[in-house]
């Protein structure tokens, strides 16, 4: 009596009871169902649901499997419960379905807590027979797990469609502002999920816009039911030859696979006997021979463990009863007291026929769809086709301009950006910000040696295009409005005027270098070089170095030079006059220069109307051209050393007694102002200082004269140009 009281009321027994309570509390999941009632002995079962959540249930110690199953179905509010079951693993790692007629403790040996998993036990041969939306949702979750684990093999196209249905059911309609292709990588649909598949899933998802979650899940099931291994319960066995085979339990019968090849199908009506003994499973099938007589064929399969053999037999009995019978087999009332042969297991649930005929869908059901597990997002390497920008190739100009470069005896150190097209081309443009220090720095660093007018289909080429490093992805500066008709008419008149000046071509060689700058005002035509209206400077040091180069004597002086210091030019024009005797001599020199340049350009440079960008232009007769040229040249030569300031180093003075002006042109450089038929090639020594760059100079409009400044008033657009540096000559 004292020992009994000591065991019951002692401190040791009380501590053991408290430890059990703490252990039970720790084993409980977030969702707990207390179903033990007033039972003193309680067991805790933890069930993992298809959506990934866990539910813990407290039951009496001697509770059977059906009680736990009913608690789970009640918690889920699931009516079509006959398609599902609770599965557990034994000590031999063999999966078993919980038998509702037996005690939980006798079946599940590993506990407490006793861990079980809710799974689909019988896959409906026709998903449209599933009446409840919740049932279809759970079927979709089960099929997702089967495909992801590799149990259910799925082709690429089918896997893409099924995954797209999953996204539509979980995320809804595709939204361009919210969803990106990388979003698909956060989900897992197949064991080997590639980037190509994710992009295909993303595109397929867009096609399913407008489907509700219920519709997407129904379409998912209707697509998945056509998979070859849909609803097949596979079990690995060995035959008498020692090779491994697989038996697949289906609604229609038993499939036999050798590896992945299906070699036989035993229909349920043809199977007359199915039993097991230890680890051997015997299958007797009746087939008709050639003469129409029935013959029995016996197949014996071996399994690794007797429990696995019994599990396969029980699954075959349940599949046969669920899909083939109208109702479950009634158990016999009498039992043999001493002798019992075979197993007493019989399927006790409803059949598919009973489930589809008796169950009726409820008017309204509500349940919560839980989101899928997310993973880290992948950075996609392929994002579809990348359309190239509308830019010219930087590798074509070198090959196209080889002839002109060989004629002038120079090479182009940088690639040239050009276009080759048979007609007008639309180019996306980008206006660069004014006074860009970085752009000016890049222009000053790169040598300027480009001959772009050799291409007949050349578009407008700006100084920014010439000096900027070759980059096919960068947009071109914005071209001005093109008036091709006006410029073509002006060019024809210029060529006609220059025909009268061909006799004086040899007189230009007699001009020597002058000390100061000889500006050239161009009142008729003004070509906007770029959006900043900036002109690259040409330093006097570079000019002085160039004049000492022996290769300079062979260079012709073209007329398309332009000085951007218009203010100094206007002051030089109105400041002084010159004697008439000097005008005649200079006029002949000017005519010689214009004729020589025009003839050269007509012979070498093709006309491209699309590349011209005139602002304004005027025409004049040849007589007025010569008269204006002589007057302006006289005024400039008189005020040459008085009004123009030289901000560079003091130039060297030549010892020549005869003062004859000659242009100083940098070597190894080629400048194009964008006018077809007028190209300028500048050649200078490599050691020339190019810190301030070069000045791009355009040809005067009504006349083609060298070193001539018009006395016409400047245009409003020209007055806005900033004074960069003076183009100097050396005496």
Curated annotation (Swiss-Prot):
Expressed in the outer limiting membrane, retinal pigment epithelium, outer nuclear layer and outer plexiform layer of the retina (at protein level). One of its GO terms (biological process) is mesoderm development. The keyword Cytoplasm applies. Its main location: cytoplasm. InterPro entries: Band_41_domain, Ez/rad/moesin-like, FA, FERM/acyl-CoA-bd_prot_sf, FERM_2, FERM_central, FERM_CS, FERM_domain. Residues 396-407 have a biased composition (Polar residues). Residues 29-119 are annotated as: Required for interaction with CRB1. GO terms for molecular function: cytoskeletal protein binding; protein domain specific binding. It comes from the Eukaryota. GO terms for cellular component: adherens junction; cell leading edge; cytoskeleton; cytosol; focal adhesion; nucleoplasm; photoreceptor inner segment; plasma membrane. PANTHER family: 4.1 G PROTEIN, BAND 4.1-LIKE PROTEIN 5. This is Band 4.1-like protein 5. The gene is Epb41l5.
